[in-house]
């Protein structure tokens, strides 16, 4: 346990137990908008949020409770899975769930106790080193055809059935399905993704004896796939990360008493939502289509998770201009959400992805919470620096859900 985290882990258990005991039902609506990778850092003096022309977000921030949240702990850079779990009130260290399980669930594969899932990227390998970890973000249709071709040629390795599932752009998932339930630790295998260009792929390495069999099969899988795609111009190699088994995690509705809908175009985020029992139908299109889907289903649910991916993608590409523009595009259609008049509207990110760093970072994430029961008036705009002035301060991400429930008047008094 990280020093100082033991108390925090116990506090998360305590929080969920207490919240469960004081839940009360009403007709209020809670909308959580996640601009993936929202937080940034200054380039030429201003961050992406500070540079963006976002009159609607700025107006909302002036009348909202604002602050900054830390998904894992100070100084710890979170992945997307931990970041989202924390937003939903699950401690990211207690519930360590591999990216593979999330990706596979999001792509419609129901995981069994016999399965190991892994998230895969098509990549460009040149002279033994990774030139591009995302194969130039190859188009989704080309990626789909490549993945379907792999499935036709690779159906089984040793005693494991191999299931390929095409994803978005360079992404896909692989599930190894064994004939019998696996013991704990069977998926404890190091990622082969070096996380940076200019480095060789990481050797497949089991981290415990229970993972040795699967690691050998993964080595054979990589060799077989590479032989098939080696003549592709960009997607001539694969990188694997997030080896995982199906986890057993409490359902969102059981904890919070909320019937919930996830609206996300990227499979991993639908997978995460499904994992905790949210309805997560496939949604296609852009942000406008996501908001249209929200409107169409608004009367059917209590809680809505709306995920917007491209903010993070541009941050990872180091594209400050386009990350800023994507935030502006969201601001332009934000009135469509405001028109629904949810009792609680939260807008934030799952982590920071500064264009300056071209990747996720440890920096606290700006958040605004709009409801009838906040002070407001402390921030002049929505940005990292302005949110430091807000009434929420800097706080653990797992506290967002209790705050949402309280502002929706869904929590009774605790104690006499």
Describe each region flagged by the PLM.
Residues 8-416:
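Feature captures the catalytic ectodomains and active-site-proximal regions of enzymes
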């Amino acid at each position: 346990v990280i020093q100082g985290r033991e108390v925090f882990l116990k506090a998360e258990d305590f929080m969920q137990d207490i919240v469960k005991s004081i839940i009360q039902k009403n007709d209020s609506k809670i909308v959580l908008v996640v601009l993936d990778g929202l937080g940034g850092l200054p380039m030429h003096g201003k961050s992406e949020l500070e540079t963006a022309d976002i009159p609607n977000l700025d107006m909302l921030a002036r009348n909202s409770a604002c602050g900054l949240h830390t998904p894992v702990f100070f100084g710890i850079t979170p992945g997307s899975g931990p970041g989202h779990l924390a937003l939903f009130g699950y401690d990211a260290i207690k519930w360590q769930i591999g990216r593979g399980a999330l990706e596979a669930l999001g792509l419609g594969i129901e995981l069994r106790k016999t399965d190991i899932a892994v998230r895969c990227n098509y990549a460009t390998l040149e002279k033994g080193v990774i030139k591009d970890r995302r194969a130039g973000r190859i188009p989704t249709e080309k990626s789909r055809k490549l993945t379907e071709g792999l499935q036709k040629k690779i159906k089984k390795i040793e005693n494991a059935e191999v299931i390929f599932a095409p994803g978005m752009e360079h992404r896909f998932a692989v599930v190894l399905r064994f004939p019998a339930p696996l013991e704990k630790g069977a998926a404890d295998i190091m990622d082969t993704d070096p996380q940076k260009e200019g480095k060789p792929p990481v050797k497949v390495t089991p981290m415990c004896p229970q993972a040795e069999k699967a690691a050998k099969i993964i080595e054979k899988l990589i060799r077989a796939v590479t032989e098939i795609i080696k003549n592709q111009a960009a997607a001539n190699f694969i990188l694997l990360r997030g080896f995982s088994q199906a986890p057993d995690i409490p359902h969102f509705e059981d904890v919070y008493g909320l019937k919930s809908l996830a609206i996300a175009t990227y499979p991993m985020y639908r997978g995460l939502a499904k994992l905790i029992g949210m309805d997560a139908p496939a949604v296609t299109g852009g942000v406008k289509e996501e908001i249209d889907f929200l409107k169409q289903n608004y009367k059917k649910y209590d809680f809505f998770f709306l995920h917007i991916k491209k903010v993070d993608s541009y941050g990872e590409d180091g594209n400050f201009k386009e990350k800023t523009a994507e935030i502006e595009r969201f601001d332009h259609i934000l009135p469509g959400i405001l028109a629904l008049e949810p009792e609680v509207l939260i807008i934030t990110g799952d982590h920071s992805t500064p264009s300056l760093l071209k990747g996720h970072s440890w920096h606290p994430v700006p958040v605004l919470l709009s409801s009838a029961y906040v002070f407001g008036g402390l921030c002049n705009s929505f940005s990292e620096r302005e949110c430091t002035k807000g009434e929420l301060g800097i706080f653990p991400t797992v506290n967002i859900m209790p705050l949402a429930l309280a502002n929706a008047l869904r929590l009774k008094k605790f104690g006499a």
